[in-house]
A protein has these predicted regions:
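A short, flexible loop at the N-terminus of ABC-type nucleotide-binding domains that lies
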Residues: 1-8, 12-24, 31, 36, ...
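Helix-to-loop junction immediately C-terminal to a conserved catalytic motif
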Residues: 53
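ABC ATPase NBD Q-loop/coupling interface
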Residues: 62-79
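Conserved ABC ATPase "signature" region
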Residues: 116-134
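Conserved ABC ATPase signature
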Residues: 138-142, 146
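ABC ATPase C-loop
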Residues: 155-156
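Conserved ABC ATPase "signature" C-loop
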Residues: 216-217
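ABC ATPase nucleotide-binding domains
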Residues: 235-325, 338, 356, 364-368, ...
């Protein structure tokens, strides 16, 4: 198991002349985890997040970062906030400079980075969030999703170990929400611990490693999503709704269907459950194959050559740069979120598909497909497109 990076021990906090917002809670977060604090408005999620980088100090109890109690002197908070980056719910409250470049440069400049290093980290951060070429744009001309990306870039420029986001998809349409969640997935795969707050169970359920269900400053339940959301009474008390897949699973059980295996975490899991239930097997003589097009290694010409001989193939893109390449090359995308599972579902129908991805996400594709193959016993081949640079 990976080591603990954040830990709370019996922490409490009461706002001046207000009710107790955090009521003696304890928990831990491990390095490289994806965590969601889930609950209704007023549950204490935002207050707890603000404690993680020292914006709010507990009245009692201990908060630890990397196994050391958080100290609240200026020098200690400065180091903590470099390691634990915070993205506010409303990016307009976080973006303060007249241009995108100046805003992203604000943090590293204040940390004393030399000018050439500031330029390097800002360029890298903007590339990471898909905003290359936006350096001189005024923030007020950006869309809500673009502003959110600027705020994330400003935090990434300081290279934190932990990224904390308060309601990261607030105010975004479904497509924008999917893009932000996939960006966070990409950052997590690169080694960052990601902590979000949300009241959207459909967003949290398939995404998190663990969820912490909160109500009135207390923890109702925590654990893997199937456990955290698996008690309908707790979910009801938190004024939330069950994730659709879990609700369907529960309703099937109530009707006398004997469901085998784990509770469904994704649509792919649900399909496996249903097919096992009805003893359905795929009629295809063999599953389809998945090809990977690494935009960091393959040229647009490589794709054109490949696609000329593979018309009708479903195409998905995962990762900011992959989606940018698709847009620049006018490549129609069938999938932009949950891409790996959707390509596996296509393969089970005997159909081939292509995943556009980046260096950092290639391993994740292999890991997810191999995990499914090992669990199901169905052989699905994953190939790299030929002609890429080493």
């Amino acid at each position: 198991m990976s080591s603990i990076i954040l830990e709370a021990r019996e922490i409490r906090y009461r706002y001046p002349r207000g009710m107790e917002a955090i009521c003696g809670i304890s928990f831990h977060i491990r390095k490289k985890e994806k965590i969601a604090l889930v609950g209704p408005n007023g549950a204490g999620k935002s207050t707890l997040l603000a404690m993680f980088n020292g914006m709010i100090r507990p009245d009692s109890g201990v908060l630890l970062f990397d196994n050391q109690p958080v100290q609240y002197d200026s020098a200690s908070l400065r180091m903590l906030r470099k390691s634990v980056g915070f993205v506010l719910q409303n990016p307009d409250r976080q973006i303060i400079a007249p241009t995108v470049y100046q805003d992203v440069a604000f943090g590293p400049t204040n940390l004393g980075y030399p000018e050439h290093e500031v330029k390097r980290v800002v360029t890298q951060a903007l590339r990471h969030v898909g905003l290359e070429g936006f350096e001189h744009r005024p923030p007020h001309q950006l869309s809500g999703g673009e502003k959110k990306r600027v705020a994330i870039a400003g935090v990434l420029a300081m290279d934190p170990d932990v990224l904390v986001l308060d309601e990261p998809t607030s105010g975004l349409d479904p497509s924008g929400s999917e893009d932000i969640m996939e960006l966070l997935d990409e950052l997590n795969h690169e080694g960052k611990t990601i902590i979000i707050s949300t009241h959207n169970v459909e967003l949290a359920y398939p995404w998190v490693d663990r969820a912490i269900l909160m109500l009135e400053g207390k923890i109702l339940e925590e654990g893997i999503p199937e456990k955290a959301f698996g008690n309908p009474e707790y979910v009801r008390r938190a004024h939330l709704s069950l994730p659709t897949l879990l609700e369907l699973h529960i309703e099937l059980q109530k009707r006398g269907f004997h469901l085998q295996g784990k509770k469904p975490h994704t649509v792919l899991d649900m399909m496996q459950t249903i097919e096992t239930l009805f003893e359905k097997t795929y009629s295809s003589a063999s599953p389809g194959a998945i090809t990977m097009y690494n935009v960091d290694r393959h040229s647009p010409e490589s794709f054109s050559s490949w696609h000329a001989g593979h018309s009708g193939v479903s195409i998905g893109a995962m990762g900011t740069r992959a989606k940018q390449r698709a847009e620049n090359e006018h490549i129609h995308l069938d999938f932009t979120y949950g891409v790996i599972d959707k390509c596996i579902l296509r393969a089970l129908l005997g159909e081939n598909s292509l995943i556009m991805t980046t260096d950092t996400m290639v391993d994740r594709v292999f890991q997810r497909v191999n995990a499914y193959v090992n669990e199901s016993g169905i052989p699905i081949t994953v190939n790299m497109m030929e002609g890429g640079s080493p």
